[in-house]
Amino acid sequence: MGGILALKKDDCHAAPTHLLAEDGSYNTTFLQKYLPQTKIDLICVAGRQQGVVSRTGLALAELPGRAFVNRQRGSGTRMLLDFELKKAGIDPGSIPGYEREVTTHIAVALAVKSGEAEAGLCVYSAAKALNLPFVPVSQERYEIAIRHEHAGDPRVRALISAIRSARFREILENLGGYDTTETGTLREVR
């Protein structure tokens, strides 16, 4: 959410976003709400696998009663977790540690690896980096939102070029948990 707010204030030319709306769509709802008069270009970075990381292969339905580590309120991962818990009929209050927040995917995986938590929600690549079991929950759409008036800026053009490169796709595929089918595609939001 911070990236979209920075775009709104024109503090940046581009911001990463993976915000899930209540209708199951990604990013456009929030851009239309917070930047209704601004033309935005969205460039797809990748589809990104989010799931439950644990030491024992826990699934989402097994989280009640388990020590959990969460992402911060307002993050795309937290929004995804809340969406999936609601869909599954799981009360967040039944998950000890739901209010314990960290700010990165690797911090979630490290808390699990160290035994501080039994589970958390993170991207596959963070679980893979620490050799932890991962049970997929959802694939999210990870994009870069660009104020259209800045699309011609050489720095923005360099960013788009890098995202569209074969080397970038190769890096994502080697990390694991990324679907590069739509990497580099552009869509407009008004």
Language-model segments: residues:
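Short helices/loops that flank or line small-molecule/ion binding pockets
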Residues: 2-13, 19-20, 101-116, 125
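Short beta-strand-centered segments that line the small-molecule binding cleft or hinge
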Residues: 3-48
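Ligand-binding cleft/hinge of the Venus flytrap
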Residues: 10-11, 77-100
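A ligand-binding cleft/hinge motif common to bilobed small-molecule-binding domains
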Residues: 18-33, 109-138
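Periplasmic-binding protein-like
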Residues: 39-51, 132-161, 163-188
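Flexible hinge/capping segments at coil-to-helix
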Residues: 45-69
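Short loop->beta-strand "edge-of-pocket" segments that line small-molecule binding or catalytic clefts
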Residues: 60-84
